[in-house]
């Protein structure tokens, strides 16, 4: 569980960025991992696993091939469940596994807003947008680090 700390300190997120404002003032732009790794709905799950491994991420934003707009999100858990259910990752398509219409957060939103959205929706990842479109991804570990400070074992 994330607890909000109102102390001003410098926190390094897992994205390797320092958040220098108190958590109450920091925004998603201070925290997100740019650029997001994306995939299309018609691609295979094996391609998603490959991209995740090489990008060092556990989720991909699924973009509509024609509009370039986010239409879903696929996570390592989605692929793991499919394989455990006997589906061939070289055959099953992203559109069959993805969570459609993902909740998206804007770069100007607060870290607290992200924590609330992620907690209520049981999300580990949120695609991040700005006026120019999709610009990043924020993970629950980034939000927790920003709110509670560096973990003792780091």
Indicate where each model-derived feature is located.
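Tandem CBS (Cystathionine beta-synthase) repeat/Bateman regulatory domains
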Residues: 1-154
């Amino acid at each position: 569980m994330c607890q909000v700390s109102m102390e001003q300190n410098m926190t390094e997120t897992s994205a390797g960025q320092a958040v220098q404002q108190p958590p109450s003032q920091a925004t998603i732009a201070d925290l997100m991992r740019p650029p997001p790794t994306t995939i299309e709905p018609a691609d295979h799950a094996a391609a998603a696993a490959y991209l995740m491994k090489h990008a060092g991420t556990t989720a991909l934003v699924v973009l509509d091939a024609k509009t370039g707009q986010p239409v879903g999100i696929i996570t390592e858990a989605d692929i793991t469940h499919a394989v455990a259910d006997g589906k061939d990752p070289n055959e099953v398509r992203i559109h069959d596994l993805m969570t459609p219409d993902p909740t998206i957060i804007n770069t100007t939103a607060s870290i607290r807003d992200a924590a609330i959205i992620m907690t209520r929706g049981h999300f580990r990842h949120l695609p991040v947008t700005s006026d120019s479109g999709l610009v990043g991804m924020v993970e629950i570990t980034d939000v927790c680090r920003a709110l509670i400070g560096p973990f003792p074992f780091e």
